[in-house]
UniProtKB/Swiss-Prot annotation:
The chain crosses the membrane at residues 7-27. It is found in: Microsome membrane; Endoplasmic reticulum membrane. The keyword Membrane applies. Coiled coil: none annotated. NADP(+) binds at residues 40-64. This is Retinol dehydrogenase 10-B. It holds the Pfam family adh_short. Substrate binds at S192. GO terms for cellular component: endoplasmic reticulum membrane; lipid droplet. Its EC number is 1.1.1.300. It catalyses: all-trans-retinol + NADP(+) = all-trans-retinal + NADPH + H(+). It is a single-pass membrane protein. It comes from Danio rerio (Zebrafish). Pathway: Cofactor metabolism; retinol metabolism.
Length: 336
């Protein structure tokens, strides 16, 4: 095929991809079933991780929950088991007792510090031994230091990078080989809108999320280059979610109604729809797509001007001040 013909084919494919993307706005794609599939969720003990676990439980997936907090992880597991009990069909037949073992909830919990690759690899080996091969990997675990750059201890910066970014390397390296062998699987990266554009005062968090997105996109291209179309990738980039992680963050009060913090339940439902329809990327709310596009075409000074108008230039400062006050109070109580 000469270059002119190839250019025509490429142009047609690009136009066709726009047509397909537009069609999905009007025709909702059919959601795939994850019943019986093994789903690993990191950071499952609270926040979005817990909600992801409950959503997958409602769809009868086998849950493998990872968290550094054993107690909160077990609480999530018990919530999932309760969902399983409610979903259990009541046949009323005489042989229903024989069917019960097939209907028992399948929830496994593991205590794992995803910032440590040795812990990740060891836990992944336990999962393969005790549960089997996995089908879905939800890289969700995340932390925020809540400190200005010059006030933030190096250890906190390192931990933010390790949990929010490096952990994605370790979990993927642990589970991807079998996915490649079977040409089957789904990897979900729960990032943030702060991995697409930035604001002042959260340099470490933004850098970690930019890194996670870069890792995700590069891996997506690698899988396509290897013709591993059976392995799906979904990137989740929500706006600030009302989980308490960024409590105190404020923009200009006149603009606040247009950019409210997302309800966690809404965020996860939108993400689940994207995952179950094999959507490559989901930004919530949709205006985040426009914000990301504007960043690529507007001069930097224009972006700064818009930030100041919205109040986004210092929106994290109340949150940082609140974190600092909380830290000082804790130190005074403990006599540090």
């Amino acid at each position: 095929m000469n270059i002119a013909t190839e250019l025509f084919v490429v142009t047609f494919k690009i136009i066709w991809s726009f047509v397909l993307a537009g069609a999905k706005w009007f025709i909702r794609p059919r959601e795939k079933s994850v019943e019986g599939q093994v789903c690993v969720i990191t950071g499952a003990g609270s926040g979005l991780g817990r909600l992801f676990a409950l959503e997958f439980a409602r769809r009868r997936a086998t849950l493998v929950l990872w968290d550094i907090n054993r107690q909160s992880n077990e609480e999530t597991a018990e919530m999932a088991r309760e969902i399983y009990r409610q979903l259990k069909p009541s046949t009323g037949s005489s042989d229903s007792v024989q069917e019960l073992p097939l209907l028992q909830p399948k929830v496994y919990t593991y205590m794992c510090d995803v910032s440590k690759r040795e812990s990740v690899y060891l836990t992944a080996e336990k999962v393969r031994s005790e549960v089997g091969d996995i089908d879905l990997l939800i890289n969700n675990a995340g932390v925020v230091s809540g400190r200005h750059l010059l006030d933030c201890p190096d250890e906190l910066i390192e931990r933010t990078m390790m949990v929010n970014c490096h952990a994605h390397f370790w979990t993927t390296k642990a589970f991807l080989p079998k996915m490649l062998e079977l040409n089957h699987g789904h990897i979900v990266t729960v990032a943030s809108s702060l991995g697409l554009f930035t604001t002042a005062g959260v340099e470490d968090y933004c850098a970690s999320k930019f890194g996670a997105i870069g890792f995700h996109e590069s891996l997506s291209h690698e899988l396509k280059a290897a013709d591993k179309d059976g392995i799906k990738m979904t990137l989740v980039c929500p706006f600030l979610v009302d989980t308490g992680m960024f409590e105190g963050c404020k923009i200009r009060k006149e603009m606040a109604p247009f950019f409210p913090p997302l309800k966690p339940e809404y965020c996860v439902k939108q993400a689940m729809r994207a995952i179950l329809t094999d959507q490559p990327m989901i930004c919530t709310p949709r205006v985040m797509y426009m914000v990301t596009f504007m960043k690529t075409v507007l001069p930097f000074d224009a972006i700064v001007c818009m930030y100041k108008f919205i109040g986004a230039d210092k929106c994290m400062y109340p949150f940082l001040a609140q974190r600092k006050e909380s830290t000082n109070n804790n130190e005074s109580k403990t006599g540090i």
